[in-house]
Amino acid sequence: MSLNFLDFEQPIAELDAKIEELQLVNNGQELDLDIEDQISQLREKNKEQTKKIFSNLDAWQTARVARHPQRPYSLDYIPRIFTEFDELAGDRAYANDNAIVGGTARLDGKPVMIIGHQKGRSTAEKVKRNFGMPRPEGYRKALRLMEMAERFNMPIITFIDTPGAYPGVGAEERGQSEAIARNLKVMARLSVPIICTVIGEGGSGGALAIGVGDRVNMLQYATYSVISPEGCASILWKTAEKAPTAAAAMGITAQRIKELDLINSIVEEPLGGAHRDMDVMAAHLKQAIKKDLSELEGLSKDELIEQRYDRLMSFGYC
């Protein structure tokens, strides 16, 4: 896969280009030990440069990694982590929303319910998925699947990756705020384990609507916020160009959110971000989900609900 590099990754991109150039020179010829040695040195330098850049990302750079066009989405993780995924569609009231995907699957043989936001890569796919911004029917579909999981005693696993709930007139007319609020209420009371992971953007109420859980985790370069940095900047400074300043002030990174005890853990990403190696990222995520699930399965239903309630009530300052 040819990688897309962000502007702050240009030193890495230049090293990658040099490596590719040397590989082309060496391709189809007898092994040139001198060229092989140069490639090896450049790869080591590339690795060190990547470590240096990604160990010093600011909040705005992290937000851009979270939005990377090649970053894995829910439908990239599902086949790498689960088996026998059977997608379920529709809210049984109005329509099917492709910005939310969900269905039954097995995690190492155990039945689970999966729900996640889904963005698109091509223009047609982005339109089909509404750029990952769910409408009310998407959240009502998620609610239907959660209630089904409750009936069949299946753990719920959610993947969060949305810039926010869709703010269109039609969505508001069909009860966007009610759909989100109802999900929050129901998720707080479900008696099955709920494990939520922010895999990309955790945008405001659109993220929270499938984000109330017993365990809430974030990938290393994911973000979680009440509004996008651009939206915040437009309100406070009347220009989206102040987005980097807004991102720093809002505390949107996994590290900052963990310091505030709003999430349980941070899932490590491959060097350079999840898009550099989807298989490795999926393996890390699967390990984290299995660890959380093993801890939660030992609790009774009453204990599960009580601990979830206590977790929610611990937020904020008093």
Swiss-Prot record:
It is found in: Cytoplasm. It is an enzyme of class 2 (transferase). SUPFAM superfamilies: ClpP/crotonase (SSF52096). GO terms for biological process: fatty acid biosynthetic process; malonyl-CoA biosynthetic process. Residues 34-295 form the CoA carboxyltransferase C-terminal domain. Keywords: ATP-binding, Cytoplasm, Fatty acid biosynthesis, Fatty acid metabolism, Lipid biosynthesis, Lipid metabolism, Nucleotide-binding, Transferase. GO terms for molecular function: acetyl-CoA carboxylase activity; ATP binding; carboxyl- or carbamoyltransferase activity. One of its GO terms (cellular component) is acetyl-CoA carboxylase complex. Pathway: Lipid metabolism; malonyl-CoA biosynthesis; malonyl-CoA from acetyl-CoA: step 1/1. Gene3D superfamilies: 2-enoyl-CoA Hydratase, Chain A, domain 1. PROSITE patterns: COA_CT_CTER. Its EC number is 2.1.3.15. It catalyses: N(6)-carboxybiotinyl-L-lysyl-[protein] + acetyl-CoA = N(6)-biotinyl-L-lysyl-[protein] + malonyl-CoA. Belongs to the AccA family. Component of the acetyl coenzyme A carboxylase (ACC) complex. First, biotin carboxylase catalyzes the carboxylation of biotin on its carrier protein (BCCP) and then the CO(2) group is transferred by the carboxyltransferase to acetyl-CoA to form malonyl-CoA. Acetyl-CoA carboxylase is a heterohexamer composed of biotin carboxyl carrier protein (AccB), biotin carboxylase (AccC) and two subunits each of ACCase subunit alpha (AccA) and ACCase subunit beta (AccD). PANTHER family: ACETYL-COENZYME A CARBOXYLASE CARBOXYL TRANSFERASE SUBUNIT ALPHA, ACETYL-COENZYME A CARBOXYLASE CARBOXYL TRANSFERASE SUBUNIT ALPHA, CHLOROPLASTIC. HAMAP family: AcetylCoA_CT_alpha. This is Acetyl-coenzyme A carboxylase carboxyl transferase subunit alpha. It comes from Colwellia psychrerythraea (strain 34H / ATCC BAA-681) (Vibrio psychroerythus).
